[in-house]
Regions:
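Membrane-embedded helix-loop-helix hairpins and adjacent transmembrane boundary segments
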Residues: 1-507
């Protein structure tokens, strides 16, 4: 227990120290939100990876999908690396950096408002982002707290409050630069931790080959006379597995907190280097998490919840509980790192969106600050400082709201994530990507995709999820491209000279 406490205290002190160190660079909006658009490839790649993989993945998804699909769940991690990281950086990285810098966009809602010349899109996009990031944040709290209860015996309520306080401190102090620096430190812990944990868990089962053989001997859930499904290449349910891969891999392309990493990177050379770093990070962390979760059935049946469903969130903790204290301490730091980095990214994204796209969207100054229609440098600096203060206040507000949900958590972690990813990526992915590439994308098509992505997700939830939330999210994302394309064919195009000026950044 002493080892676990010491390592955790050191970790928290380092995180807060980085926030204090970075506070001078967080005095302006660009500095607070984007790190001055000068963050290097290593910090950006690790910020992308650590925001991608949190306790939602390590505890929720790895446990649930490892139980359902066995060792074939590893394909989810492979998809996350190839589609969610490699292709995301190749397809979105350069164009996002160039266009957002060219049109002076700081957030995804700001991009929609400027690219499609619609303040209405900007406002609605910011509301969608703010509302649907809350359930994802609550899921992050739930995941880390499950591990803390196992490792320290600390009640769930204390865990979420402690985590929220320390995350708020370093984000409020240092903004994006502090978040990126901490993400790098946390990413190193995650890489080392996942490799060590996999080795320890497999060793407890007699080694890799013995563990795989045990998995091959397990009977199928649908037919007890059939063995081997949980150790096969595609697993017992390949079609639903594909839905999970699409949601968790393609979904990142439309999430504001993920795409925002491309806004802040320094230049095109850094993007090329960051692509490689981010992909390798995802292979190790995501591939490792799902590979580990694939062995969950070797550790007994999980508890049954009052609603009659299995408690999938308990599977990974049950695999780790018999490990030595040092390994458990490493696991706690691993998940704490993953969760705090994701939480920091989420609250920073939400607060910046609310501040820049709702409160200050028309860039108004206070009465008496404008003389003869011009804002001088002193006034402009004053407005910038005020925006940063508002963002810091909203960080506290967002954390409190998500904390209240986390203290009374609905449904499973994976379903929470499925709802938020489905709505956000279903609404944003297609219009964002096509807005970067296709000049004929219309404003009406973006509105249609917002309605499509949010509508299908919410209606499915209100009807009691007749379509699995994971599959519904995948349908929302893929269908969004059809919606944007079809509506763009039959609706009014933007003025050609306006669009050409926006696309000058690629010349």
């Amino acid at each position: 227990m002493v080892i676990k406490v010491i390592l955790t205290l050191i970790f928290i002190l380092v995180m807060v120290g980085v926030g204090i160190y970075s506070r001078k660079q967080a005095s302006s909006v660009d500095g607070f939100v984007l790190g001055g658009r000068s963050v290097g490839p290593w910090l950006t790649a690790f910020a992308y990876g650590t925001s991608y993989f949190s306790a939602v993945v390590f505890v929720g998804y790895a446990g649930q999908f490892g139980w359902k699909y066995g060792l074939s769940a590893t394909w989810i991690g492979v998809g996350n690396a190839i589609i969610g990281s490699l292709l995301a950086w190749i397809v979105l990285g350069r164009r996002t950096k160039l266009m957002t810098q060219h049109i002076d966009s700081r957030t995804m809602p700001d991009f929609f408002g400027t690219r499609f010349d619609s303040q209405g899109l900007r406002v609605v996009a910011s509301v969608i982002a703010f509302v649907f990031l809350i359930p994802y944040t609550a899921g992050v709290y739930k995941g880390i707290s499950t591990l803390f209860e196992m490792g320290f015996g600390i009640p769930y309520e204390y865990c979420v409050v402690i985590m929220a306080i320390f995350t708020a401190v370093y984000v409020i102090l240092g903004g994006y630069k502090a978040t990126a620096m901490n993400d790098f430190i946390q990413g190193i812990i995650m890489l080392f931790g996942i490799v060590t944990v996999i080795a320890a868990v497999l060793n407890s089962q007699g080694g890799l080959f013995t563990a795989v053989q045990k998995m091959a001997e397990l009977p199928s859930d649908t037919d007890a006379t059939v063995n081997g499904g949980f150790a096969s290449l595609l697993g017992p349910d390949p079609w639903n597995l594909l839905g999970v891969i699409i949601l968790t891999s393609l979904g990142t392309w439309g999430l504001p907190q993920m795409v925002g990493k491309f806004y802040s990177i320094t230049d095109e050379q850094a993007i090329r280097r960051g692509t490689i770093i981010s992909t390798l990070f995802a292979f190790v962390v995501a591939g490792g998490c799902y590979f580990l979760g694939g062995f969950g059935r070797l550790f007994g049946m999980p508890p049954v919840l009052p609603n009659g469903r299995l408690d999938f969130d308990s599977i990974v903790p049950s695999m780790l509980i018999t490990l030595p204290d040092f390994i458990i301490a490493l696991v706690v730091l691993l998940v704490l790192s993953a969760s705090m980095s994701t939480l920091a990214s989420l609250v920073l994204t939400s607060s910046s969106t609310m501040t820049l796209d709702l409160i200050y969207r028309d860039k108004k100054s206070a009465p008496g600050e404008v003389e003869e229609g011009a804002i001088d440098d002193i006034v402009a600096e004053k407005i910038e400082r005020r925006k940063v203060v508002v963002m810091r206040v909203l960080i506290v507000f967002f954390i409190v709201i998500s904390l209240m949900i986390a203290l009374n958590p609905p449904t499973f972690i994976a379903q929470l994530m499925g709802i938020s990813w489905g709505a956000l990526a279903g609404a944003f992915l297609a219009p964002f990507m096509m807005g970067l590439y296709w000049k004929n994308t219309t404003t009406a098509s973006v509105w249609a995709c917002f309605v499509w992505g949010v509508g299908i997700t919410v209606i499915n939830m209100l009807l009691g999820n007749p379509i699995n939330p994971i599959n519904c999210g995948a349908i929302a994302m893929v269908g969004g491209f059809v919606v944007v394309w079809l509506v763009s064919l039959f609706t009014k195009k933007m003025p050609r000279n306006t669009v050409d000026k926006i696309f000058e950044c690629y010349d």
